[in-house]
Amino acid sequence: MRISRRTRTSRTAAAGLAAAAAVLTLVPATAAQAAPAAAAAPVAAAAPAPVSAAASTSAPGGNAAILGIDYGTWQREVAAIVDAARPAIEQRIAASPAGEKPALVLDIDNTSLETDFHWFWTYPTPAISKVRALTQYAHARGVAIFFVTARPGIIESLTEYNLKAVGYPVSGLYVRSLPDLFDEVSEYKTSKRAEIEARGYTIIANIGNSPTDLVGGHAERTVKLPDYGGKLS
């Protein structure tokens, strides 16, 4: 099934607005939820599969469950892709010359957060542990972490809170303001990466789950996570 860029944009905006409405009643209770589930540590040490199939074969909820996307399969595919990309990123970080300002750029929904695998009232939305671990590793070594999302500006503060609450370092967050809504998502995201470069940063990797997150250049390498033909936002 192919989903147009306009449909994807509308779905992202609608989901964001729904989340904003739900959070107004849920924010007082978020403190107890802020710590992410401790899944990352056993993953690296466990047997071959990075995620237990018995524990994760079905999604907790959300659009992914409605569409029949298997949660455990998705987690394993994401883990395999990030694990394959990480050595080159680590080497690039280690080779950064003095004075360089390296940066990672990430999409948010189903790239940094498990957005489509939880109902919109789940707040904060859990992090994707492998991606979070990569950003924490990079940030600890002087790499700036930028998020470029098609989410509307009305939920910028809620989005930033969510990212920080689940453990992401945030050097900058780009959301779609009113003028940006007239651009295709790919054009908007490309322009924001160009802005980051104009600030003196070198984008060593751009991570996303949709082609619209990755096309347009302005990054040394791209890392493509699964979107199952556009089923995931």
Would you name each region that the model predicts?
Residues 119-145, 153-157:
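Short, acidic loop-to-helix structural element flanking the phosphoryl-transfer center
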Residues 66-78, 117-125, 146-152, 180-183:
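Second-shell loop/turn segments in exported
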Residues 90, 94, 136-143, 153, ...:
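Sec-exported extracytoplasmic/periplasmic mature domains
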Residues 2-106:
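Non-catalytic pre-domain segments flanking phosphatase-related domains
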Residues 102-117, 147:
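Asp-based phosphoryl-transfer active-site loop
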Residues 93-103, 145-151, 173-175, 204-207:
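Surface-exposed patches in mature extracellular/periplasmic domains of secreted proteins
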Residues 83, 87, 129-136, 157-161, ...:
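Solvent-exposed, polar/charged alpha-helical surfaces in well-ordered, non-transmembrane soluble domains
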Residues 51-55, 156-233:
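C-terminal cap/substrate-recognition subdomain and adjoining C-terminal extension
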